[in-house]
A protein has these predicted regions:
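Acidic catalytic patch
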Residues: 42-44, 64-89
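Short, well-structured N-terminal submotif of metal-dependent ribonuclease cores
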Residues: 1-39, 55-60, 136-150
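Amphipathic coiled-coil/heptad-repeat helices and related helical stalk/stem segments
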Residues: 23, 94-95
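Acidic, PIN/NYN-like endoribonuclease modules and their adjacent C-terminal/linker elements
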Residues: 2, 71, 104-150
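Short active-site alpha-helical segment characteristic of glycosyltransferases
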Residues: 98
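A generic structural signal for short hydrophobic patches within well-formed alpha-helices
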Residues: 10, 45, 82, 118, ...
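Acidic active-site catalytic centers that drive phospho-/nucleotidyl reactions
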Residues: 6, 95, 114
Length: 150
């Protein structure tokens, strides 16, 4: 499974804002799972540094961004992605870039705290809790499925 993690999921955890425990569970699960390929936009890293550096020193902000970089793959910022984001109907250019990035690599799900910002998405958009519930159902179904017979 290939997922795209929106910047606000990382910000949830960094700032421990409302809903952060679900976001933390997503990040922990994708870090431990060999079945989940996690991606984010190249735009996410400077945004995370900016938000983090507002509350901690430069070294800590850079260390935190580097830790995230080691756990996710980055969708490169290309002219095609920027063109798609500019042409998109959504009012938030940053969200348009995130969506264009996710769609460019054909992810199964985009995980975000703000689903309403991705109403025009052609891919599945879930909040962290919805994605976690989906994973729990899949795990239960896997346990209930009998092994193939002889």
């Amino acid at each position: 499974m290939k997922i795209f993690i929106d910047v606000n999921v990382f910000i949830d955890v960094m700032t421990k804002r409302s809903g952060w425990s679900g976001s933390l569970r997503v990040l922990n699960l994708v870090r431990k799972s060999r079945d989940v390929e996690s991606w984010t936009s190249a735009l996410t890293m400077p945004l995370l540094y900016f938000f983090r550096h507002r509350v901690v020193d430069d070294t800590t902000a850079r260390t935190d961004v580097r830790a995230i970089l080691s756990r996710v793959q980055l969708v490169p910022m290309t002219e095609a992605i920027l063109d798609q984001a500019i042409a998109a109907a959504g009012a938030d250019f940053e969200d348009n870039i995130q969506l264009a990035s996710a769609e460019s690599i054909s992810v199964d799900h985009l995980i975000t705290r703000n689903k309403k910002d991705f109403a025009a998405a052609k891919i599945s958009v879930l909040n962290p809790e919805e994605w976690l519930a989906l994973q729990e159902v899949a795990a239960l179904e896997a346990k209930l499925t009998p092994p193939p017979g002889p």
